[in-house]
């Protein structure tokens, strides 16, 4: 396998092996939750530390990008065509695998940039856009995958038309989960309340991560992010970089945080405050409709639900 090839110093061979099963190794090596996936299944982790599979995947993926390793092998074209809706990680992985199997593949992306959550959602400090994402997408295109942006399936074209007059044999829908979920508490409509999805999209689109850009994003002096997942960590760490005093509010204890341990560790290193066992009940505002505070109640853990 690829780890054996790394041990032997055969990095080109390692890249060839990993490319057979991983379409975006440099991306996955950075942002996937390895501790609950590949590394979580490593038997060495029973008594000690598991093999750092994610870090090795990242190294091999980056080596492949830097050294221009040969593109993955593809089967002869079978004459069948598949339309892929969405250019996020699911769409890119699907398109890559199908192209390797000999299918003609075209990705339709609604927005003007390719990459989905890799470009609009995950911050630059976790996933470099030009150095990593753009080059991984170029690797997918090297397999013969076509990509068309600014196409809203359902408006510009329809699934029926893709399967009909456009001549596709199948359609893969990988449109993502872009709609946010709110808490349903009073005050959520106040100015200054935004979903993490919107905040991160604005930050990435407006290049808030680049010091040379004057980014017109409203960030208060004190920012509270409600939640404890990876998106919450991305949002709170982005707010910190934009100059805010940033705090995580989470209804359970640190042990129950769904975010990766690595992300929580980085957030603490950067000075993010954590208010655990704290649950918001209302967003407070002034007479002009702007946020002034967050009313919360203290929680305590009970027995797990059946």
Language-model features, listed with the residues they occupy:
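Residue-level detector of alpha-helix initiation sites
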Residues: 23, 88-90, 113, 229-231
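Long amphipathic alpha-helical segments
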Residues: 1-29, 33
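N-terminal Rossmann-like FAD-binding beta1-loop-alpha1 element of flavoenzymes
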Residues: 80-106, 232-240
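Glycine-rich FAD pyrophosphate-binding loop
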Residues: 103-119, 247-255
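Predominantly flavin-linked oxidoreductase catalytic cores and closely associated redox partners
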Residues: 208, 213-226, 230-246
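Short glycine-enriched, charge-decorated loop/helix-capping segments at active-site entrances
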Residues: 121-127
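FAD-binding core/adjacent interface of flavoenzyme oxidoreductases
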Residues: 2, 26-30, 35-85, 100-101, ...
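A Rossmann-like FAD-binding core segment of flavoenzymes
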Residues: 132-181, 198, 204-214, 241-306
């Amino acid at each position: 396998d690829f780890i054996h090839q790394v041990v032997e110093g055969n990095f080109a061979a390692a890249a060839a092996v990993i490319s057979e099963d991983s379409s975006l190794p440099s991306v996955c090596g950075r942002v996937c939750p390895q501790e609950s996936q590949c590394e979580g299944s490593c038997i060495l982790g029973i008594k000690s530390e598991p093999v750092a599979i994610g870090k090795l995947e990242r190294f091999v993926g980056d080596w492949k990008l830097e050294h221009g390793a040969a593109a993955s092998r593809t089967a002869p074209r079978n004459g069948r065509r598949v339309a892929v809706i969405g250019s996020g990680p699911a769409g890119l992985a699907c398109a890559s695998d199908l192209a390797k199997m000999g299918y003609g593949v075209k990705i339709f992306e609604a927005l003007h940039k390719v990459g989905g959550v890799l470009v609009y959602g995950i911050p630059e400090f976790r996933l470099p856009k030009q150095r990593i994402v753009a080059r991984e997408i170029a690797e997918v295109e090297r397999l013969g995958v076509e990509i068309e942006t600014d196409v809203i399936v359902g408006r510009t074209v329809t699934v029926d038309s893709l399967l009909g007059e456009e001549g596709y044999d199948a359609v893969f829908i990988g449109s993502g989960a872009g709609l946010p979920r709110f808490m349903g508490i009073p005050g959520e409509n106040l100015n200054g309340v935004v979903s993490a999805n919107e905040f991160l999209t604005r930050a990435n689109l407006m290049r808030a991560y680049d010091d040379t850009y004057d980014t017109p994003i409203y960030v208060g002096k004190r920012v509270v992010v409600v939640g404890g997942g990876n998106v919450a960590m991305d949002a709170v760490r982005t707010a910190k970089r934009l100059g805010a005093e940033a705090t995580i509010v989470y209804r359970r204890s640190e042990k129950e945080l769904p975010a990766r341990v690595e992300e929580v560790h980085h957030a603490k290193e950067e000075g993010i405050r954590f208010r655990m066992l704290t649950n918001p009940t209302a967003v407070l505002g002034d007479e002009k409709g702007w946020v002034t505070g967050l009313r919360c109640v203290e929680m305590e853990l009970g027995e797990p639900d059946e």
